[in-house]
Every structure is written in C-alpha cells, then in structure tokens.
C-alpha cells in the first residue's frame, strides 16, 4: 500500500465496502458520541467520515486529535448504519472503521477556524491565507478559477489562436498608470518596468507574422487602492489578431466569452445576442460606460418640458445651452415614501436632492415639480418616458458631463430599490465608438481617453482635419452586469498616423521614437492591420463565483493598502542590496 494513501477523501463509495484502505488529510472536526469518536477527514477532493471506538488500538491517539492536524489513517470501509447517510457528501453512504492513526503534522491553536462560515477580519484572513484557503467556499472559488482559465485556453485554441508568453521585465510605457520599476544592477541608473499589459509585445507578434496570439497574462500597475481592482497585479486573457476589422474581433471573441459564461453560470441565462451600444448612448441612457443591462430603466432627456416652465431652478439652468434635464423613470415607485427615500439618498451622495413627479390615478402628476410646471407639461413628460399610474420619475439637471455618473448611480439605486434588476442572469454587451481623446482638466491639455495605440475612425485624415475631441476610435469594451470585463481596439499600424495621434496628446515625434522604439521601428518594415482585446480574468471569475470581492477569487492577494500580510511585502532592502543596485532611498519627510 502507498506510504500515505490508497484513496483520496472523496473517492470511496459503497463499491469499496469491505476493503482495507489508507487515507491522509486534515482533521476537519472531531465529534464524541457516547465515547465513540467520529473524525471527518478532509483533503482537496472531499471528506470522509472515520469512526474510532474504544476497542480500536488507535483510540488513545484519536482522543488527542484537534482540528487541522494532518494525519494518516488505516481502516476498513463499511456501510453507515441505517438512517445516518449524508446525501450531501459523495462519500455519505460509507464510513471508515479506523485501526491505525499516524500524526503527520500537528496543528497549533487556530487564528481562524476552517470549519464553518464565520466571518473574520480580512487582515487576519490574509495573514493566515493558507488556513483561509482550506475553507470550503474559498477553496471552491479558486478551483472554479482554474477551470475557467482551462476553458478559456481550450476555446481560444479552438478558434485558431496560439499561446505565447511575453517578457515580464520590459521598458516603461504610458499605459495610464504608474509602473512598478525594477532597478538594473548591470546598468546602473537604469530601470526595467513590470508590464502594465503586454500591449506592445502582442502587436510586435503580429508584425512578426504569427497572426493569432493569446495568453493568460499577468499585469502590474502601481495604482492607488480601488474597491473594484486588486492592488499590484491582475490577470487578463490577452488577445491579438492580424488582418482583421472590428467585426472580426467581435466574431472571434463573442463565442469564447459567451461559452465561458454558459459553462459556469450554474443555469443562469446568458445573453446570446450581444447588444452594441455607442459610448455616448451608454452615458445618455444608462449614466455609465459599463451599464448594468439587467436593469430595464433607460433615462431620457426631457429638457424641452422644463424650458420656460414654472420650475425656475431648471428653467434658469436651461438658459445655458450646454445644460440639460434627464428623467429617470421609476416603474412602481410612485409613493411619497419612496421618493423621499431617494431624495435622502441623493443628499447622502453630496447632491442637493432629486426632483420627482409621481403619477396618481387617472394619470395626474403629483409632487412639487408637477405643481410648478402644470398638468400639460407633466402629461407630456409621462407620454415621452412611457410611465403609467403608480410610477414616478426622478430628474437630474445641469451639465451632463458633470452629472452623468450620478444619474447612473441613481438609475442603479432605483433598479435595486424597486427590484427591477434581475440578479439571476448575465447580460453581456459591447460598448463601441469611444472618444479617441478627452480634455484633461488637471493638466489643461488634450489627452488619450483610453488606449493610445487605437486606430482613429477616419484614420490620418481625421487626425489632421477634425477637432480632436470629436474623433472616435475603433475601440470597444465588453460589459457584464455593471462591470467592464474586457477592453480592446483596432490598432494604429500606420507610422505617420501613430506619430500624429501622439502629437495631438502632446508627445513629440522623438519622444514617440524614444519610448516606443521597438514598435515604431517595426512599423517601418511592413505592419499588418491588426486588433485585439484583453478580458479581465479576475472580474470574470468574480462574477461567475457570485461574489463582489476580488480577494475571494485570488490565491494570495494584497490588502487594500497594497501589503502582502502573509509574506511581509513590501519590505526594506538591505544596505548590501541597495549598494549593488546603486540605489539610495530618499524617504519623504514626516
């Protein structure tokens, strides 16, 4: 018999009754029933009930066992007594009568329990992550992640893609966040950077003639902590294709992402035909470039109904041509209590409040706004936005560039409060026609709005002749249930157009050559049209596992202060290490 086990703890069935076996694993829990000890033994594969009675030679040692001891036990498989089956366990019809126990690894007092669903402070869980990972739900999440990545690989290979690994030590580039820098010992004063994404390398692969690339790529960004992003590193399904249009990328990737969701959705419906929503439309209808389309509410502009009306606050605002009034329909929300609750919520979000109209029996509008603008305008609003008796609508006014995010939050809040958002499905969509540039208020200059390597719609001609803030890019996102889960674009592969695109954003040609020398050189020697995307593995796994915390689907994540509490990173370097790297630490003044 094998030194440690003949079977795993999830393998034994009724067909094994009568066999002498050996198991190894962790003591999940010990129960004493009238002097007979029941030991639940657990490993990666499952759990088996083991029985030790006072007649067993192993009894004296079994009495000393505690949770999370690692043990080996020999025994005989037998049928559980009638009425004691556990249908929740694959091994629930059998048990092991134990004849011998060996302790392989004793366990001290546990800083957090493995058995049970008790909530513990996150810092404790991260410091003792090896214990946390033994807990059933987290262990399942990690294995679901493994299977999702396997599914992604299988589907990408089925679409004719080849998996390549790109360098981890590379050059710094402006991807939109700070780089993690690595000092070079061999080249004093110079630094490598960990890749924020394999963007340039995957484009270089297309110029090298490999046609279709993918990898599960680690990416590193030195960003301030955010609730929807893990600090430090994350993983993406990175993709690039040669000789393709935007439609070709969509046709290749929709079945991959849809297939992964269908495989792991646990029966929840997954949208078959993805909607394509222009960026500007997404902001206007949903107040977000990653709208939750499970919520049926669509906002509408209703400025004309308030222009010159008796509601002077909105009427005066609309004298400025850039200002608008948007309506957020609230089906079933026509009660004073709900409207007051939404008003209080808005004030908690730093807003002066939310104007509203409720529609009573007979279609009569009620509330301060309705009283100020009169029945004719109230009826016209109702007709435009399609509400009925018992419904309400909330109104947001001002410069849409400044209020669209809040209006999106209000739409989400209404959907949640009125149970309009269907939580039992996955709604996928493409967001298209992103602006190529945006105005950076802090730096008072035009800047790239997203990926600087995207092809502008209209090409070089648009870059030379259009107002930069009106240029759209061949750039797209995939959204699911209010999350951006992928982003991509058709690349700007024309050297002159690349230089012009960066020039508009304030980069001179020499700076482009210096910072993107490898790719710029490659463009001079025959670059194919190409495009691709990157899908966030972590967010996809998070959605499919039904959690909202990325740490619940990651093996060894950092905390929100970007600290690895298990390994003690970041840590100070020794004087010797710093000298070898020719680096001096200049700490900020306290």
Swiss-Prot record:
Coiled coil: none annotated. ATP binds at residues 221-223, 484, 536-539. L-aspartate binds at residues 175, 221, 450, 491. GO terms for molecular function: aspartate-tRNA ligase activity; aspartate-tRNA(Asn) ligase activity; ATP binding; nucleic acid binding. It is found in: Cytoplasm. Homodimer. Aspartyl-tRNA synthetase with relaxed tRNA specificity since it is able to aspartylate not only its cognate tRNA(Asp) but also tRNA(Asn). Reaction proceeds in two steps: L-aspartate is first activated by ATP to form Asp-AMP and then transferred to the acceptor end of tRNA(Asp/Asn). The record marks 33, 83 as: Important for tRNA non-discrimination. One of its GO terms (biological process) is aspartyl-tRNA aminoacylation. Residues 199-202 are annotated as: Aspartate. It catalyses: tRNA(Asx) + L-aspartate + ATP = L-aspartyl-tRNA(Asx) + AMP + diphosphate. GO terms for cellular component: cytoplasm. Belongs to the class-II aminoacyl-tRNA synthetase family. Type 1 subfamily. Keywords: Aminoacyl-tRNA synthetase, ATP-binding, Cytoplasm, Ligase, Nucleotide-binding, Protein biosynthesis. It is an enzyme of class 6 (ligase). InterPro entries: Aa-tRNA-synt_II, aa-tRNA-synth_II, aa-tRNA-synth_II/BPL/LPL, Asp-tRNA-ligase_1, Asp-tRNA-ligase_1_N, Asp/Asn-tRNA-synth_IIb, AspRS_core, GAD-like_sf. Its EC number is 6.1.1.23. Pfam families: GAD (PF02938), tRNA-synt_2 (PF00152), tRNA_anti-codon (PF01336). This is Aspartate--tRNA(Asp/Asn) ligase.
